[in-house]
Amino acid sequence: MPNISSRAYSTADADNLAATGLHPVLARIYAARGIQDMRQLEHELSALLPFPAMKNAEEMARRLADAIGASKRLLVIADYDSDGATACAVAIRALREFGATVDYLVPNRFEYGYGLTPEIVRLAVHVGCNKRSALHHVEQHTAQCASLIDALRDLPIDRSGKPDILITVDNGISSVAGVEEANRLGMQVLVTDHHLPGDFLPDAACIVNPSQPGCGFPSKNLAGVGVIFYVMLALRAELRSRGTYATKPEPNLAKLLDLVALGTVADVVKLDDNNRILVHQGLKRIRAGRACPGINAILKVAGRKAEKASTYDLGFVVGPRLNAAGRLDDMALGIECLLADSEERAFTMAQQLDALNRERREIEADMLASAETATQDSARSAIRQMESNTSEGATLFRPTDCFSLCLYDPDWHQGVIGILASRLKDKTHRPVIAFARSNNGELKGSGRSIRGLHLRDALDLVAKRKPYLLQKFGGHAFAAGLTIQECHFEEFTATFEEIAQSLLTPADLERIIECDGSLEIPAMNLNLAKALTEQVWGQGFPQPAFQETFVVKSQRVVGEKHLRLKLGKAGQIFDGILFFHNEPLPDWINAVYRLDVNEYNGSQSLQLMIEYWEEASEG
């Protein structure tokens, strides 16, 4: 059973916030999230951190301005997730408005893997700025070779149409070999990324990454889309200084904030003060009907209203449908949807994304069932081994005895292992790495971690302890990707477990549900629920939840799998909803809940959305 913990907060900070006229409950909530000054809650664009604070942003802007002035050919190299797709769309839309000759290329994860690899660089030479005909030529040559990689190695280099500059978005900081290949072939590389750098930086012409050594940018939490947005701000300022807009209006980069908000939320980066401004402004545009046709279309096919859009819609509605393209097919579909200017074209592609997402859910459900069966079989096997083992000191292995989980099934889908790792991490409250089979005896792994184990740093320890185990890896504190040889799976699993045990304590493995304490009855009202919906909540700035003991006055199943509740507290009755649970509740429950605005037939009412419950004694 998880432990329920109330978030600590500074009473002095809460009192100072309340003294400005802020509701005392809101003051307490914000203080628990590190807010000390009301200025931290400002969402105006004028409060954004200035781009000159970003190392190399102005230098990259000068290089891009020179390239545009010289009619150089630019090619954006994107990542195949939502952050990469939105970053690509921001780069393409902005650069075209600035007058650049630009196209994009996104690696297919199943053929090329992640990032600016040497193979992608060689493909970029053939793609140039005539993508369709070049790709057709490569595909024809591939049919004569054993693999696509062999085809790219063997294909003669035609430098006549190659790009002059490659611009990476949401990748590139670890692409040492890829940048080296680009340099050899006479292409400049401009890296924009937000992932943590390794021991060696690529020899790129310019790198913009808030996490790179020597960058004093105060916010280290920008997503890849946020980084390229800052570069575009710097580029506009550079073009302005050159007199480009002396006789014509400047491009309005604020119209790209819907894309910035989507990528920021979908990539689950921390919503610090700066990111909350970006997300707030993006949501404001979406709600006002000024989003790009692609985002509107995805919301529409999902049955969501743009005017009511929230961070939930970005993270759990639009993001997964966009990601489905990169997981199961080709992220070019998602990028084209975001670049579409026609509502009809955007809607057609949004329907395709929705279909891919439904397929992804089915695959995910099968993989999750397979993973749970595998862990149960391991436990049963260990029990049988213990029962038949008479030697002193025999121990029973269960997944719960481990500090980490590494799982592999040859039938698992490479594009869905990240979601699988996330689901298993939530279930077991342990770092989880799920592997799927790739090519040439390789396994692709995707990991998710918990507080207390920085996943990228843990993988770095594996690499330093046993360099032959990891072919490549990268990521963040809570998510990372890696490649190993299948023959090394068992040894990697054991080594990663050793490192997990050295970094984590048993207390770290206990699931903790954080909430914001109890609410007084007068505060449990519709006005407070509405006030809470006006803030941007997400990773690192969690949506408020509260804890109370209720008597269950009535309960009924709705929609076959949810419970509609009447909950009593101190003589008051509150409407409640418990999703994905249709078994009867006990008479008394201890519940963690959120204040929610329920809209029905044009009217609004307070609803308690139950996040967690356990049986309680009478309150």
Q: In which residue ranges do the predicted regions lie?
A:
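OB-fold and OB-like beta-barrel modules that bind single-stranded nucleic acids
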Residues: 474, 532, 551, 586-599
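Structural detector for short beta-strands of small beta-barrel domains
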Residues: 539-559, 591
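A common structural junction motif
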Residues: 465-470, 498-505
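Conserved phosphate-handling catalytic cores of large alpha/beta enzymes
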Residues: 124-127, 166-269
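Beta-strand/loop nucleic-acid-binding surfaces
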Residues: 568-584
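OB-fold single-stranded nucleic acid-binding module
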Residues: 488-492, 588-619
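Single-stranded nucleic-acid-binding OB-fold domains
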Residues: 555-560, 578-583, 596-607
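Hydrophobic helix-and-loop "lid/oligomerization" segment in the mid-to-C-terminal part
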Residues: 2, 7-132, 136-140, 144-165, ...
